[in-house]
Amino acid sequence: MTYPLNPELMYMMPTHFGPMSGPRQGPGGKKFAFEQDQRKCMAVSVSFLTNAAQLQELLPPGFELMGEPVVTVFETYMKEIDWLAGRGYNVLGVNFPVVYQGQKDRAVGPFLTVLWENLTDPILTGREQLGFSKIYCDLPEPVVYNGETHCTASWMGFRFLDIKLTHMKEVAAVDYPPSSSLPTDGTLSGTIHYKYMPRTGEWGKKDAAYAVLSPASEKPNPPQSLMQGEGTVEFHRARWEDLPTQYMVINAFSDLEIKEYRGASIQHSVGGGDLSNQRILS
C-alpha cells in the first residue's frame, strides 16, 4: 500500500517519511509553530553606487531598475533560531532596488539576486518553499579589531569576498532612519525574488519560473542598536577551477563598477518572521 500526501501539510523530498519540519511547520505537522521566533541577529551592510547598465543585465523578465543603481551587500549572523532548536546560521546577500510589473501585480523593493547560506536546511526550504535564490558558502563570524570589522565569504578554501567597515559610530535611537512607508496605490512592497526550477529530463525547460515577494512588514521591529560609518566591498574574481559552480556569480559582482560608496552599517536586532506570507507575483 502506498502512502498518501495530506494536502493540509507541507512536504519536501524525501516525502516517504512524512511531513517535513522546517521554518513554517513544526514537529507533527504543526503549521507556523515558530512565527514568534526570537532569534538574535547581527547584520552588516555596505552600499555602493554602480553602473545601471551592468545591473540591467541581471534583471529577469518583468523587472526594471528603480531609482539610483545602488547595490547593497550584507551579511547577517543569526543565533538561537527556534526552528533549528536554538542553533543558528549566517547569510550573505546582494540586492538593489527594482520595480516588478506582472500581468496583475506591481511590486517595488530590493531585488535579492542571490543569498548564500552556510547551512543546508535553510537553503533547501528557502529555495523550494519560498523561491529564494539560495546557494552555499562558508561564512565565518566577523573579526573585530582595532576599530575595524572584517567579514569574509569562501567556498572550499577559495575566499571570494572581503568586507571592511571602519569609523563606525553609534546612532541614537531618536536618530534611527525612519521605516519606509508602504505604497497606498495598490503597489506591493517588500523583497523581490525570482524563482526558477528546471524540469527533469527536459533540459533547458522549466517546472517553475516566476517572481515572488517577501512582503514588507507594516510594523517592522526597530533595531536594538545601530552603528553607521564607512565600508568597502571586494569580490575576488574567480576561475572555473576556483568555484566550479559559482564563478559566474562572483565574477558578475567583481565586474560591477564602484562609482562611490554610500555608507555602511552594523545593526543588532531580535526576532524574525517565518515568511509564511510569501506570495507569487502574477
Give each language-model segment a name.
Residues Q38-K40, G86-N90, Y145:
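Solvent-exposed loop and beta-edge segments used for protein-protein assembly and interaction
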Residues Y77, V99-Q103, A153-R159:
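Short, flexible beta-strand-to-coil junctions
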